[in-house]
């Protein structure tokens, strides 16, 4: 019975000491991995930041190249009064004097072009 206790005590001491060593090793490995993970995250963050800056630069470049004159100015839609001398009807519309039902109105209106 005494040998069983000694054997059990010896196995217990070995298990605790080896387990403690493994625990310290595991702690060291985890520390190294978290440091590597942080460096990887920093690298990924910097890479993403560079890509976003490039994209932003491209977008700003496109905006600066766009001329204000290249865009169509605000136009007047169909059936809306327009100025005879300065028609701003949208493309496909013409500033004409109303016929029939609109003759009592005093101004011109934007109408679709007639295709003959």
From Swiss-Prot:
Keyword Protein biosynthesis: no
One Gene Ontology CC term in the entry: extracellular region
Propeptide: 22-74
A molecular function GO annotation: toxin activity
UniProt family annotation: Belongs to the neurotoxin 14 (magi-1) family. 01 (HNTX-16) subfamily.
Function as written in the Swiss-Prot or TrEMBL entry: Probable ion channel inhibitor.
Name of the protein in question: U11-theraphotoxin-Hhn1c
UniProt organism field: Cyriopagopus hainanus (Chinese bird spider)
């Amino acid at each position: 019975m005494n040998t069983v206790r000694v054997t059990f005590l010896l196995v217990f001491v070995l298990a605790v000491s080896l387990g403690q060593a493994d625990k310290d090793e595991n702690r060291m490995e985890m520390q190294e991995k978290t440091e590597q993970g942080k460096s990887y995250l920093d690298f990924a963050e910097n890479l993403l930041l560079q890509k976003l800056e490039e994209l932003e630069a491209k977008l700003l470049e496109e905006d600066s190249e766009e001329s204000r004159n290249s865009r169509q100015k605000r136009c007047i839609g169909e059936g809306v009064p327009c100025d005879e001398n300065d028609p701003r009807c949208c493309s496909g519309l013409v500033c004409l004097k109303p016929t029939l039902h609109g003759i009592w109105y005093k101004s011109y209106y934007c109408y679709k072009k007639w295709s003959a």
